[in-house]
Amino acid sequence: MRQFRKIIGAFLVIAITLCTIASCDLLGGKKPEELTATADEILATTPYTVEMLLKYDANDADMLTAMSDVAATEMKLTVDGSNFVGKLALGEENYIIYTFVDGTLYTEWSENGTDVQEKKEITAEDKAGLLAEFGTGLKYTDFSEVEVASAKDVSVITCRNINSDKVAELAAPLQAQLEEVFDDVVVTVYNATLDIELENDSYNVIVLTCEYFITVNGSTSYSVEMTYSMKYSYGKDREIMAPSF
């Protein structure tokens, strides 16, 4: 029983860590603010936005290459809730302006004096992937089976069968915590399900369910299911549900 209590304590530490990640102000939601910084600095403070910029520039490979050179890149970014405007300067004649409003990414850029405009719809699956990545460390592409159910106001994405290359990564935080308590412990994740609910672009619910198999001192084994739940609104408060197991 003492060993089991120590294991549960380690789970709570992991849950608090995930809750801290989920409660971070990813979009500067407290109030609209303007930032002028290098891309790597912005990456550290607004990862959701920068990931959107890097992922959804769908046209110019050279432009993407320049964007990835964070040491030479500067951005000016205005964030307001889930909407943002970003301008990326690449020399005197080349620039990109992104405007992300209500699920649509508008892109305008100038390349050697030629102005180009386009817009791209961001799908529920795309949003879910980014939300999941910053809420739990996983993306929907980390699963081999993905189901999307959409109604008028709600989209629900269910991800099953986690890819084998992510199993060790998912088990690592708990493994590290338990190694501080036990000399000989092995943690294995044999099942994980990620459920993401998006409603009216107003709030999101992310639920990660993990089934762990834990072996202590080579003999005593435990099978534990842990559920991490988090709910938050764009630009508003984040609500973290109590972890359950």
Residue positions per predicted region:
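Gly/Pro-enriched, hydrophobic low-complexity segments
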Residues: 153-245
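An acidic-aromatic
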Residues: 74-133
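Short, solvent-exposed secondary-structure boundary motifs
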Residues: 61-70, 85-92, 126-142, 177-188
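Flexible, processing/modification-adjacent segments and terminal tails
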Residues: 111-177
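Sec-dependent N-terminal signal peptides of Gram-positive bacterial secreted proteins and lipoproteins
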Residues: 2-27
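N-terminal leader/targeting segments and the immediate start of mature chains
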Residues: 19-78, 238-245
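One face of beta-strands
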Residues: 46-56, 68-88, 96, 103-105, ...
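Tryptophan-centered short beta-strand motifs
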Residues: 32-35, 113-121, 220-222
